[in-house]
Swiss-Prot record:
Gene field: mrp20
Chain spans, region Disordered: 194-228
Subunit-structure text: Component of the mitochondrial large ribosomal subunit (mt-LSU). Mature N.crassa 74S mitochondrial ribosomes consist of a small (37S) and a large (54S) subunit. The 37S small subunit contains a 16S ribosomal RNA (16S mt-rRNA) and 32 different proteins. The 54S large subunit contains a 23S rRNA (23S mt-rRNA) and 42 different proteins. uL23m forms the wall of the exit tunnel.
Protein name in the entry: Large ribosomal subunit protein uL23m
CC terms in the record's Gene Ontology section: mitochondrial large ribosomal subunit
């Protein structure tokens, strides 16, 4: 512990600029390092900082925590657009403003390139893309409904799951397959859920656990006794 304090004191003495003397323990500030724009030079770093932050706070923070020397800091506040409190309903309000700072680094920093599509598959990137597409589509239709227009079902994208459910429904109606009450859902099989999505095969018509059935019977019998 003494060596750490000694190192910190030595760093303060060797600082190329005058640093603040006020010590802050366990701060709750959130500082976000933002990926730069395509043509932004590598000696400029962009951060999202709290509104009460000033330029000296960011300069001292980068120097004390990451040992990064900063030669200058520029700050600006982004005013948010008006929006409704609950999506497309509720009172109109202006969200809290966002403060950003651009620090001029003494040593340039180059961001690493984003990983390729193949490398992202290990982090469930395919599912993330599906969720993002569904969220964008839902936001689009919410905006249309907010203007008083009706969105017909024909404009919704037909997913693989809906196509598979429709195919299984036609088999049930034609009599090719029969529904089995008390069994595992027949939709959870390798035909409906593709293997490339990471799902394992589930056996059809697999009986439920006997312990679960007995527990359900006991709860139903207790409920009938209570009513009597």
């Amino acid at each position: 512990m003494a060596s750490v304090a000694k190192t910190g004191a030595e760093a303060l003495r060797n600082a190329p600029f005058r640093v603040g003397k006020k010590q802050i323990f366990l701060p709750n500030h959130v500082i976000t390092f933002v990926r730069p724009l395509p043509k932004q030079p590598p000696n400029l770093a962009t951060f999202i900082v709290p509104l009460e932050f000033n330029k000296l706070d960011l300069r001292d923070y980068l120097y004390h925590v990451y040992n990064v020397e900063v030669t200058g800091v520029r700050s600006f506040v982004n005013q948010r657009m008006h929006e409704q409190r609950h999506g497309d309903v509720g009172n109109w309000r202006r969200p809290k403003s966002q403060k950003m700072m651009i620090a001029e680094l003494a040593k340039p920093f180059v961001w690493p390139k984003p990983p390729a599509e193949d490398a992202r598959e290990a982090f469930d990137y395919a599912m993330w893309k599906k969720q993002k597409t569904a969220q964008e589509q839902d936001t689009k239709f919410q905006g249309i409904r907010a203007q008083g227009e009706v969105v017909p079902p024909s404009q919704f994208e037909v997913t693989k799951d809906r196509k598979a459910i429709k195919a299984r429904q036609s088999k049930f109606l034609s009599g090719e397959e029969t529904w089995a009450p008390g069994k595992v859902n027949a939709f959870l099989n390798s035909k409906i859920v593709p293997e490339e999505e990471g799902w394992s095969e589930v056996e059809e018509n697999l009986p439920l656990d006997e312990s679960a059935e007995s527990a359900a019977e006991e709860s139903s019998s207790k409920g009938s006794e209570t009513r009597q």
